[in-house]
Amino acid sequence: AGAAREARDLGAAEVLTHQVDVADAGAVQRVADETVHRFGGLDVWINNAMVSVFAPAWEITADEFRRVTEVNYLGTVHGTLAALRHMRARGRGAIVQVGSALAYRGIPLQSAYCASKHAIQGFHDSLRAELLHDCPGVRLSMVQLPAINTPQFSWVRTRLPRHPQPVPPIYAPEVAARAVLWAADRGPRELNVGGPTLKTRLADKLVPGLLDRYLARTDVGFAAQQTDTPIDRSTWRDNLDVPVDAERDHGALGVFGDTSRDRSPALWLATHKPAVSAAVLLVGAVLGWSAWHGAPRGHR
C-alpha cells in the first residue's frame, strides 16, 4: 500500500500491486502475466525478496535451510523466468537481481542466507551468458549491497540473545534504491555498492584463509551482528514462513536510522566512471604540463 501511494504521488496514472510468495513459481508467473495484460509489457523486473536465519549452522533446521533457499534463491529464479517469458518475446527488457557482498563471502551466523546469495550469483553468471548469446536485448544485472537499514532485522528468525543487525557500516535504503535504479537503466553486469562490499570481495579474493580467522576471532563475525538490546522471546515474531503484520505498512526504514549512512562515495565513483576518468586525465595532464614547464632548461 505504501509503495502504491508513493507511486501515485509521483504521478503514476495506474498502479498494480500484489502480495505473493515468491517460492510459488506459478503465483509469480501469474503476477507477471497480469502485469503484461494490464500494461502491455514488462520493461524492468527487480528480484529483491529475502528471508534469513541468524544462528550457527548446526542450530538451523533442514526446513529452515530449505525455506531460505526457496525464497531467496528459487524466488529469484522464479521471478527471472517469469519476466523472461515476456521479455524474450519482445526482445528487450532489464532484470536486476538484488545481491549482497555475502554472495562472494559467507560470514558466521548467516550460513543459510549466504549460501542462497552464492547460488543467485552462479545463476546470474550462467544466465547472463545465455542471454548475450540468444537475446542480447534483455539485460541482466546484479547489485551487490552492503548492510542496509531495512525492517528485516526486526522480524528475522534468530536464535541470538540480542537484537540482530547487519554488520556495520549500515547504509540507508535510498543508497540501495539509487543503485538498483541505475542498474536497471544502464544494465551493467554487476554493481558493487559501498566500500565494505569492495573490501569484502577483495579480502576474500586475496586472503580467504586469513579472513576466516579474522571473522572467527574478532567481534566483526559475531558481536557486530547484534545490538546491545536483549530479545524478548515472548513478543518476537519472524517472517520466515509468513509475513509479520501483512496489513500494516512498515515502510523501508529499519531501526538503525541514527547510525546509517545516506551516501556512498564508492557508488558515486562506480556510476560516474566517465567523469572520474576525465578528471584523472585532466589532473594527469596538468601535472605533466607543470613538470615539463617547471623542469630546468640547459643554456645554449
How would you describe each model-predicted region?
Residues 56-57, 64-66, 279:
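Substrate-binding pocket helix/loop in short-chain dehydrogenase/reductase
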